């Protein structure tokens, strides 16, 4: 872990240090809010210049135009500036010209552009166009019966797109029956694979992606179980306790002595502290397990995740969401919003402070340096989210 991160130069939380960032109720100071807002404006200008040389054919949420539309939609929600809505609209139009008709997910497939477009058209009172996008989104489910189950390329990534639409419309535009049918497919698929590989005694559910049993949020078990425990998926209590809970407990037993988690079942190397692989993604599963099953050990494991991230989360890979400081900081915000412990808000603010010096630490440049999940757009999204910490949610993942 240590060789992949910069040593954390910051002192951990105490009340007097925290006064530079927020008051005793967790409200950010005007000075710190001003620093965040100024940096957002500065990075937006850099990003817009950089996007002129981005791949015109990449419409995805992860590295392409839909991701930039998601950022501007978020900025409109935070700041209320209608210009941001217009920017989101122009980028989502580009993304709709790039649909692949292959992958169905929010981040790496056609569901992202269609879901974001539906929400944008709704906000702009173009209801006919919004309905067209929703119809196309629902029909995506028919593309591939052998689709995997994980977040980036699988059924969970499709479910996020459906829930994203319903949340932003404030009503059930996507029928609950459609969502539950996909959820049942995920459960059945997990039971079948677990039995097939003789793992049912250890974990009643099991999932693979390209013949690997991934553990983390992006491709693996933690991301899938985080969703299966969501109230909006309406998994019944019997299945939650007989299938999901023992499978979550199986992931918990994979924990390294450090408090981190492996990227795959058979990987004994304690290296990766990313949202995609490791504690920064597993923490969401643990928090949700604590909310649903009310067992203290899940909270203890989540707090251990946060300690690992504090020590090893300022990554040399950069400042992004998938494997960078901004994505890792969201883990602190999730734990802060669960516990109201100001220590975690402080840690998020310190990681934001690291991001305020964007480009000055000698980090690796991402393949798509201005994108939502690998690059600058994701960092901007995080800095804007931090302005109202109680509303902050990891984009395209956290519900």
Swiss-Prot record:
Localization terms from the record: Cytoplasm; Cell membrane
Keyword Zinc: yes
Entry comment describing in which tissues the protein is expressed: Detected in spinal cord (at protein level). Ubiquitous. Strongly expressed in brain, testis, alveolar macrophages and epithelial cells of the lung, kidney and intestine. Expression in brain increases during the first postnatal month and remaining high in adult.
Modified residues (N6-acetyllysine): 142
Mode of membrane association: Peripheral membrane protein
Major place of residence: cytoplasm
N-acetylalanine sites (modified residues): 2
Cysteine-cysteine disulfides: none
Pfam families, per database record: LANC_like (PF05147)
Record: residues binding glutathione: 317, 364-367
Matches recorded under InterPro entries: 6hp_glycosidase-like_sf, LANC-like, LanC-like_prot_euk
UniProt effect for mutating residue 4 to A: Does not increase glutathione transferase activity and reduces cellular protection
Record-listed E.C. numbers: 2.5.1.18
Superkingdom of origin: Eukaryota
GO molecular function, one term: low-density lipoprotein particle receptor binding
Function: Functions as a glutathione transferase. Catalyzes conjugation of the glutathione (GSH) to artificial substrates 1-chloro-2,4-dinitrobenzene (CDNB) and p-nitrophenyl acetate. Mitigates neuronal oxidative stress during normal postnatal development and in response to oxidative stresses probably through GSH antioxidant defense mechanism. May play a role in EPS8 signaling. Binds glutathione.
Record's miscellaneous remark: Was originally thought to be a G-protein coupled receptor.
Official protein name in the record: Glutathione S-transferase LANCL1
Gene that encodes the chain: Lancl1
């Amino acid at each position: 872990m240590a060789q992949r991160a910069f040593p954390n130069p910051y002192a951990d939380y105490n009340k007097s240090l925290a006064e530079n960032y927020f008051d005793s109720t967790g409200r950010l100071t005007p000075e710190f809010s001003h620093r965040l807002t100024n940096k957002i404006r500065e990075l937006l200008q850099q990003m817009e210049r950089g996007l002129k040389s981005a791949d015109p054919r990449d419409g995805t949420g992860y590295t392409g135009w839909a991701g930039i539309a998601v950022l501007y939609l978020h900025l409109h929600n935070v700041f209320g500036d209608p210009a941001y809505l217009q920017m989101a609209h122009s980028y989502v139009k580009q993304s709709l010209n790039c649909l692949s008709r292959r992958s169905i997910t929010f981040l790496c497939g056609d569901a992202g552009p269609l879901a974001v477009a539906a929400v944008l058209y709704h906000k702009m009172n173009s209801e006919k166009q919004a309905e067209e996008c929703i119809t196309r989104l629902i029909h995506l489910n028919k593309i591939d019966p052998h689709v995997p189950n994980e977040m980036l390329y699988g059924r969970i990534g499709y479910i996020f797109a459906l829930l994203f639409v319903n949340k932003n419309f404030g009503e059930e535009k996507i029928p609950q029956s459609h969502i539950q049918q996909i959820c049942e497919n995920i459960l059945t698929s997990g039971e079948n694979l677990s039995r097939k590989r003789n793992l049912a005694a250890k974990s009643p559910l099991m999932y693979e992606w390209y013949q690997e049993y991934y553990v983390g949020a992006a491709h693996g078990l933690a991301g899938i179980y985080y969703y299966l425990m969501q109230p909006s998926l309406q998994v019944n209590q019997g299945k939650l306790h007989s299938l999901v809970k023992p499978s979550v407990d199986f992931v918990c037993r994979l924990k390294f002595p450090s408090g981190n988690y492996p990227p795959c079942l058979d990987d004994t190397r304690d290296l990766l502290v990313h949202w995609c692989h490791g504690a920064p993604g597993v923490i969401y599963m643990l928090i949700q397990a604590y909310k649903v099953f009310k067992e203290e050990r899940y909270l203890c494991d989540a707090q251990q995740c946060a300690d690992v991230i504090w020590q090893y989360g300022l990554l040399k890979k950069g400042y992004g969401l998938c494997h960078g400081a901004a994505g890792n900081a969201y883990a602190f915000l999730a734990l802060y919003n669960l516990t109201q412990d100001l220590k975690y808000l402080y840690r998020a603010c310190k990681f934001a402070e690291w991001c305020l010096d964007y480009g000055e630490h000698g980090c690796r440049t991402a393949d798509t340096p201005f994108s939502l999940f690998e690059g600058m757009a994701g960092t901007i999204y995080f800095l804007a989210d931090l302005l109202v910490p109680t509303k902050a949610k990891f984009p395209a993942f956290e519900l």
